[in-house]
Amino acid sequence: MSSQSTQGYVQSVDHFANQQRQPEEALYLLLDPFAGCPPEHPLAIAALSEALGSDAVTRIDCSRLVQDPECWPALVRLAEPGDAPTALAPLSATCAARESAATWHHVCGWLISDQPADLIAQHISQQCQVLHQPEPHGITAWFEPVRLALLRATLKNAGEVLGPVRSWLHPDGSGSCEVFEREPMAGELAVPEAVRATQHVAPQIIQLLGAWHRLSAVQHPHAPWHFPGSSGLPENAPTHAMNLILKAFRQGLRDRADIQCMCLHMLMIHPLLLQHPTIQHEVERAAAGEQRLADRFASYDDCTWSHIVAGLPKARSYP
């Protein structure tokens, strides 16, 4: 992550904490220890409890996901109402920038609210169950950055999910941060099945984003676009990744490795690959379990890919 991108995170957090926050509101940091954080790091939850006092740290009950409370996410109060945030705020922004393309995020976001931490924590925990799929699936950790970005993209009235949180700044999965504003409740929250299904495949979307980020750092002769910024990803990258996975799924692919392979080739070679008869044939065989796409595509040379791309319409955008 470049220093310019890191500075962007720091500026976003500073503006959120000092310009958007009202005098009666506290600033909270949401951390997920499941991502792993060295105990000696100043943003380790134990270190924050010692530095800020145990009353500044409130755990979010995720007992349906993990039994040990020490592994539950934590809501950390970085600033009381009317107080300026400490140096921990820019430090957390730097940490978020460094893990922008990671599979797991220790820093999940910054929240402002005039409500007590225990009420906010309880609400976040309850929404984990509201948004989850039926058994045997567990709760939905909707507060994770990419999952939150996907929720905003798929749920029309997503702002109703925030409850006591007036505003939530979160990494957006594309290399920057976005502000998520609360909306007033309009009755009981209706969660369409498509929203739940997207959360169910979120791990595949996160995996695809990570691979896309790594591949974008390498020059590919057939890549239709190169995006500015250190992440190498376009705006709304999680939504693009979600749409590509849906396209692969609709073509009959079910094997996770095949889906990832097909999506990465659509990203790095041409977004309309599935329209080409040769690729359609390969996908049909993979869907039938007769081959794996990675093995088959490995036999294609640059000449083969150039011929395939030449037979497709000009790439205008990702799905």
Label the predicted regions.
Residues 70-120:
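A broadly used, surface-exposed interaction patch
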Residues 2-52, 56-70, 75, 113-319:
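A contiguous, surface-oriented mixed alpha/beta subdomain in the mid-to-C-terminal portion of proteins
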